[in-house]
Amino acid sequence: MSDKTHSQADVAHKLWKAIEHHRTGMLGVSGDSHHFQPMTAFGEPETHRIWFFTSKDSDLAESAGGGAEAMFHFQSREVYACIDGRLSVDHDRARIDKYWNASVAAWYPGGKDDPNLTLLRLDSADAAVWLVDGGLVKYVLEVAKANASKTIPDVGERRDLNFQ
């Protein structure tokens, strides 16, 4: 990886901005027998929380129950991350109002008062983050250079974040 180093604050900023821009990742409960599921994320960098809309009878809502260790896997073109934390069911009406949009509404015919609607809240504890520098062109060039010189490609940086 790169010898460049980003500050912890810069890595966190890039992570939260990428989540805000791309939103979709895979959410799952650690140690649960269910597969991770694609979910739309609504991140709050100031509290290190990520909110997800789901049905109250979904595998995730049932597994989260009173709280469960969970992971959210996220990727964009420049940021890859695995965020670990505590997942719980939440019925925060202010968050429902704040994050409600046409895409969310499509899943809940009863609107914001749909009896199946609930929220999941991931209180992020830490994250492993990979920052990819230069995009696809740099990646292809670095792979070619590494194969020719028998070295490792320099495509970015891996960092750990602690949100506690």
Question: Can you describe what each PLM-predicted range is?
Answer:
Residues 38-41:
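Conserved beta-strand in the GNAT
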Residues 2-4, 113-164:
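C-terminal edge-of-domain segments
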Residues 53-55:
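Short His-Asn-centered micro-motif
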Residues 16-31, 68-72:
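A short, Trp-centered hydrophobic/proline-enriched beta-strand micro-motif
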Residues 1-24, 156, 160:
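N-terminal leader/targeting segments and the immediate start of mature chains
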Residues 46-51:
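Short active-site oxyanion
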Residues 60-126:
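Short, structured beta-strand-loop surface elements
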Residues 14, 32-36, 62:
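Positively charged, polar, low-complexity stretches
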